[in-house]
Amino acid sequence: MTTVQLQKTNQPPVKAPRGSYWITTFGCQMNKADSERMSGILEYMGYYPAEEELKADLVLYNTCTIRDSAEQKVYSYLGRQAIRKRSLPNLKIVVAGCLAQQEGESLLRRVPEIDLLMGPQHCNRLESLLNQVDSGQQVLATEEQFILEDITTPRRDSSFCGWVNIIYGCNERCTYCVVPSVRGKEQSRTPEAIKSEVEDLAKSGYKEITLLGQNIDAYGRDFQSQNKEASAQITLSYLLKYIHDIEGIERIRFATSHPRYFTKELIDTCSELPKVCEHFHIPFQSGSNKILKNMGRGYTIESYKNIINYIKSKIPKAAISGDAIVAFPGESETDYEQTLSLIDEIKFDHVNTAAYSPRPNTPAATWPRQLNEDIKVKRLREINSLVENIAKERNQRYKNTSQEILIENINPKDSFQLMGRTRTNRLTFFPRSLENGVENKLGELIKVKITDVRPFSLTAKLL
């Protein structure tokens, strides 16, 4: 599980300075987008980025509970801040996100030094909740509520690629997953609000946006309770068309998709819209229909293959990535081999893999036939080896080809290189300047020629 820290900004505070802040983000892209929003609120309130975590006047941990390892890391960080608070009583400790929602009062009892504990549905209430903290209260905010439309401009972690939440929550009931219980029911933002945010990004010079949702292709389903006619019309396909022609935006991505809602209409739309990038992340989780049924995923391997085959027929150069869980309770050797076979058959460009981790208050955590750690380690090692080999094989198709790259950053391991991604989401490294000394700038779209490939990245030269 990675930890992502937001970078500093030079924007002045909107209100009188109140002190420095530090945000550490654990987990998924949704959390990263939430952290950007909360950072924007903090800076509106008068907070400014700290030089480092241990010098901050306010620390905020935006947490993840998808696996136990992420939880344990949060507890370690909290322990360090609790010690700080003994000598710095004015230090504010904020815990947000899925772990906060899941643990609630028990987390406050475990770490009483926490000033504010809030679930992911409360990100936009951060200012009012911190005002309660300033009045001397210890605040717990985990009750379910309607998502407030965005009230403060996020402080983006990138100046070129922007996250845009379009749907919050999840209505699925996968037997291994805590997300529905911690992120609440699906709530779609209106197309008008989304378009307005994307237009603001375009005016600020952003070239690429990634639309985000726990099940992004379920966008618009919840509108049915308000207006059945509107629900039938407002889908992810509709939204992509609605925002596609915004001037300045050159690339559109979306994640994460659920196979149940990935329709032919959506694939057709993506094939017709030139700004939609040719990369689709569609988790499959297992290659065994038995395991998929036990997981409560709501589709079969056959229906999943139909989706992938249709994508390949309509968008032949598309890159496909997915997620897989190994060692789910009751997973036999045959079930596991079916997962390996599926990966080998589809030839995924990348697969995010994980060994099953029992999560509190999920059905699968209490089932018999839990697999031991030795099996988990063995299967995870084997599947990762297969994924890496196929990824390198797939990347061979890029060698000696010209690719469009959006320059995102300087290579942190080599200051003479820049880095960016192809439209198919391949991370690519290339020199900072042409032979004549002209240097490319961050945020530019350029053409490069791929000279070397590795399993998960490419090397290129400038054209």
Curated annotation (Swiss-Prot):
Binds 2 [4Fe-4S] clusters. One cluster is coordinated with 3 cysteines and an exchangeable S-adenosyl-L-methionine. [4Fe-4S] cluster 1 binds at C28, C64, C98. [4Fe-4S] cluster 2 binds at C170, C174, C177. Residues 19-135 form the MTTase N-terminal domain. Its cofactor is [4Fe-4S] cluster. It is an enzyme of class 2 (transferase). Gene3D superfamilies: Methylthiotransferase, N-terminal domain, tm_1862 like domain. CDD domains: Radical_SAM. Its main location: cytoplasm. Residues 156-393 form the Radical SAM core domain. It is found in: Cytoplasm. The keyword Transport does not apply. GO terms for cellular component: cytoplasm. Keywords: 4Fe-4S, Cytoplasm, Iron, Iron-sulfur, Metal-binding, S-adenosyl-L-methionine, Transferase, tRNA processing. One of its GO terms (molecular function) is methylthiotransferase activity. Signal peptide: none annotated. Monomer. Belongs to the methylthiotransferase family. MiaB subfamily. This is tRNA-2-methylthio-N(6)-dimethylallyladenosine synthase. It comes from Prochlorococcus marinus (strain NATL1A). The lineage of its organism: Bacteria, Bacillati, Cyanobacteriota, Cyanophyceae, Synechococcales.
